[in-house]
Regions:
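Short, conserved clusters of charged catalytic residues that mark active-site
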Residues: 261
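A conserved acidic, glycine/proline-rich C-terminal tail/linker
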Residues: 319-333
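Beta-rich carbohydrate-recognition and catalytic domains
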Residues: 27-68, 72-141, 150-204, 208-258, ...
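Short, exposed beta-strand/loop patches in secreted or surface proteins that constitute
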Residues: 148, 266, 333
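Polybasic, lysine-enriched low-complexity intrinsically disordered terminal tails
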Residues: 1-34
Length: 377
């Protein structure tokens, strides 16, 4: 019995030696979980386990709300900066990281960014009227709605700064990528790039220079508004971008009759720059929706194509139960392994994520096909 058995084993081994080896494909650190992949690749889809970040009631600085996230991809992970509000009603930024784009692996125990002198101007409160502003509930001011852009080895952040009384301005800061991913929050001193005495929100920095200059997209209504500078150091506290306030007028007979502003930083494609934007419909008021447009690569003031339908609408419970109902507000988006991950705030209270096959989204926008977000049941 033993001899035939050895002969059989030897034969098998010989066969294995002569078989052709197929090299294994390296696994990506980011993978789409089967339970969230749509059978129809042209449809954006929410993560079924949304929200991915919720208020931490044991943490004084993020106990009330965690929302409006921005994101960058680096070191095989998605790095998220989100707005947080706690017991003092002061808005700060928190940090979280995800290896698969969905599950939060780590969440910072301390704020990643606090504008130390957010009361940045002496205010004559007796003679200066207080504006009626309560974006997300940060009654006592702070930092709001961050937008991250990674250029070379440096992370740039634009955000809205509110002094708690009458000034809502755009500020710019930056940090080395190495410090950022290691949670060493050595941010550069912030500098205001919007003028005093004006209200501005939703400004973003392009991820690369255009025609040799840095480009800041600071408005989409009444037209595309972009500021070009040779060096970001030109913003020294005396130079400001003069932006025309949104007119609110969108495309006639369309869902985006009231344009609000840009979402995440633009993403480069072969067709142009992908820009996600927030808008409302006069026929469906009080509901923030997300649309998409393509801007020309060399002249991004020119709109190449625009989605006929919103790619995201506030239809889920977590987008309607919170500080402000009917809100989906995206400040971050990354492309990984051919998938677009969109990070957004729901109801000004929680952080959520939705995905779509990147090429399918772009082709649908260019061909003007309706794009609709669905939730997998």
């Amino acid at each position: 019995m033993a001899a035939p058995k050895k002969k059989k084993v030897k034969k098998v081994l010989k066969k294995k030696r002569t078989s052709k080896k197929v090299p294994k494909k390296p696994r990506s650190k980011i993978s789409i979980k089967k339970r969230v992949v749509s059978k129809k690749p042209h449809q954006l889809q929410r993560f079924v386990a949304n929200p991915i970040i919720s208020p931490a009631h044991h943490s004084h600085w993020q106990s009330k709300a965690t929302f409006n996230p921005t994101a960058i991809f680096g070191d095989g992970q998605v790095h998220i900066i989100y707005r947080a509000i706690g017991a003092g009603d002061v808005s700060v930024f928190g940090y979280a990281v995800s290896k698969d784009g969905f599950t939060i692996e780590k969440r910072g125990t301390k704020p990643a960014y606090i504008q130390r002198n957010y009361h940045f101007e002496r205010i004559d409160k007796e003679n200066t009227p207080k504006i009626n502003y309560s974006s997300g509930g940060g009654w006592n001011g702070g930092v709001e709605d961050p937008r991250l852009t990674l250029i070379d080895d440096r992370v740039y952040m634009l955000y809205t700064s509110f002094n708690g009384w009458n000034a809502i301005r755009i500020a710019l800061t930056s940090i080395s990528f190495k410090d950022f991913v290691n949670e060493r929050w050595n941010w550069s001193p912030h500098v205001f790039i919007s003028p005093p005495g004006e209200i501005h929100k939703n400004w973003v920095l392009f991820p690369e220079k255009i025609n040799g200059k840095y480009a800041i997209l600071h408005g989409i209504s009444p037209h595309i508004q972009i500021e070009y500078v040779k060096d970001l150091k030109e913003f020294d506290g005396t130079k400001f971008i003069h932006s025309i306030p949104p007119s609110g007028k969108g495309h006639s007979k369309s869902w985006d009759t009231w344009l609000r502003g840009v979402g995440p930083a633009p993403i480069k494609t072969k067709y142009g720059w992908l820009v996600l934007y927030h808008a409302m419909d006069i026929k469906d008021p009080n509901r923030y929706k997300l649309g998409a447009m393509i801007l020309d690569l060399n002249n991004p003031k020119k709109v190449v194509a625009i989605s006929k339908q919103p790619i995201l609408e506030p239809d889920e419970v977590y987008e309607n139960e919170g500080f402000k109902a009917g809100v989906v507000y995206a400040c971050g988006a990354v492309v990984v392994d051919g998938w677009l991950f969109v990070y957004y705030g729901g109801a000004d209270t929680v952080v959520c994520v939705a995905t779509i096959k990147f090429d399918s989204l772009i082709k649908d926008i260019v061909s003007n096909k309706p794009i609709k977000l669905r939730t997998k049941k």
